[in-house]
């Protein structure tokens, strides 16, 4: 490695992409192309970074397996930043094995962390937990230790384990300060701020609505009350044996019924009101009433033993088991597309296919939702056809952790 390449690599490790480019900007050899690609990625020029890294990977000879593996890791990180989540992780796994075989522990761990972050974006929390658990960040460069701790913090936040998230963020902050990389320090500060922003609106009979932070939501979900969670679309009841969770995200009609009944608790909701709210019909007939009875029966079966549904003279009322209190958690974002807006709130440009993958929905469904949001000026599109990406303004003032896909209940 010549002195300019070494100096450029040190600049990149310190978070100084401009300093790195000054040393190798005019060079076309594969090591310089790789460093230029990484520098462009740090500057946010991901398309150019992808091009340079591709040229570098093709330029290394077949015998330079370590250099090619490092290029693959950099390409995977650029793909993650561009929210290209549909590719197979097989190449990244191969790169990890090559790096470990050649004793490059730091880059191997970096590659594994890229895989963890991809799983977190896709909402695959169990898989992310399994991938993160065996990783040992001791003895690593501070910047990499900070990334590892940030991944632990994000997983803990998505699991609603705020104490573990705070501890991981403390480790991330210490490592980021030691690394002296401003971008890492800003990322830690933003993650810590999410803990202190409102995360949901709490509605309960006899009390005024109030905003809850994540720690307060965690405490509420651990208390002996029935929680109708409109953020994650389900019902939860904590007990000595553990939390009972009834997911209704894939049953929109049943969830709409549960939500309407919870909003009226301890009172009831008349049949015409339920039909208008759930079936969007202002002129109910016998067909609507029959369908309402069927859906109420389905909901009654799903909610046992958390709650029952009593028929009243004018409609239906939700009755939590054992006379428990009921709380309705409402999301901070108004509208049916809260999870979609929560994904876009990270400021990255997402493709329709990546959004569909993260939401576990069809591309057609996501396209319809994006069209509705675009008509309301809540999202905007850049590019055309396969290059089209979607952006949304940041959602200042509250956190969207509870709205992200697969944000699981407390175990």
Residue ranges, per PLM feature:
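Positively charged, aromatic-enriched patches within helix-turn-helix-type DNA-binding elements
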Residues: 257-291
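DNA-binding patch around the recognition helix
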Residues: 285-288, 292-328, 371-391
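Amphipathic alpha-helical segments of tetratricopeptide repeats
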Residues: 21, 28, 54-60, 93-104, ...
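Short boundary/linker motifs that mark transitions into or out of structured domains
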Residues: 8, 15, 185, 190-255, ...
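Short, amphipathic alpha-helical interaction segments positioned at domain boundaries
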Residues: 325-335, 395-411
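Residue register of alpha-helical TPR repeats
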Residues: 2, 31, 38, 70, ...
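"A position-specific structural signal for the A-helix of alpha-solenoid helical repeats
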Residues: 6, 35, 67, 74, ...
């Amino acid at each position: 490695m010549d002195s300019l390449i070494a100096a450029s690599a040190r600049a990149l490790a310190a978070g100084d992409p401009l300093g790195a480019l000054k040393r190798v900007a005019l060079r076309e050899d594969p090591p310089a192309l790789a460093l230029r690609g990484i520098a462009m990625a740090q500057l946010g020029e991901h398309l150019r970074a992808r091009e340079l890294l591709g040229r570098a990977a093709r330029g290394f000879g077949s015998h330079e397996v370590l250099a090619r593996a490092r290029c693959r890791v950099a390409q995977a990180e650029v793909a993650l930043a561009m929210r290209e989540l549909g590719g197979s992780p097989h190449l990244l796994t191969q790169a990890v094995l090559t790096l470990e075989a050649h004793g490059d522990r730091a880059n191997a761990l970096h590659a594994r962390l890229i895989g963890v972050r991809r799983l977190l974006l896709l909402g695959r929390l169990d898989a992310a937990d399994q991938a993160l658990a065996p990783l040992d960040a001791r003895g690593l460069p501070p910047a990499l230790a900070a990334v590892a701790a940030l991944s632990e913090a994000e997983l803990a936040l998505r699991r609603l384990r705020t104490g573990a998230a705070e501890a991981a963020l403390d480790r991330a902050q210490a490592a980021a300060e030691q690394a002296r990389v401003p971008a890492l320090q800003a990322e830690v500060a933003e993650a810590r701020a999410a803990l202190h922003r409102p995360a949901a609106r709490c509605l309960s009979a006899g009390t005024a609505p109030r905003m809850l932070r994540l720690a307060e939501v965690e405490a509420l979900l651990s208390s002996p009350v029935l929680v109708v969670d409109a953020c994650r679309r389900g019902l939860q009841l904590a007990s000595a044996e553990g939390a009972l969770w009834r997911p209704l995200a894939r049953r929109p009609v049943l969830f709409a019924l549960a939500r309407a009944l919870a909003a009226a608790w301890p009172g009831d909701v008349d049949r015409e009101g339920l039909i208008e709210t759930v079936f969007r019909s202002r002129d109910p007939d016998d067909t609507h009433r029959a369908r309402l009875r069927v859906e109420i029966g389905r909901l009654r079966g799903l909610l046992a033993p958390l709650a029952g549904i009593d028929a009243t003279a004018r409609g239906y009322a939700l009755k939590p088991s054992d006379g428990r209190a009921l709380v309705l958690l409402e999301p901070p974002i108004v509208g049916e597309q809260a999870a979609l807006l929560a994904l876009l709130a990270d400021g990255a440009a997402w493709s329709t296919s990546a959004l569909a993958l993260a939401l576990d929905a069809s591309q057609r469904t996501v396209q319809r939702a994006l069209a509705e949001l675009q008509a309301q000026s809540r999202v905007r599109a850049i590019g055309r056809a396969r290059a089209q990406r979607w952006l949304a303004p940041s959602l200042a003032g509250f956190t969207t952790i509870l709205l992200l896909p697969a944000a699981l209940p407390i175990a």
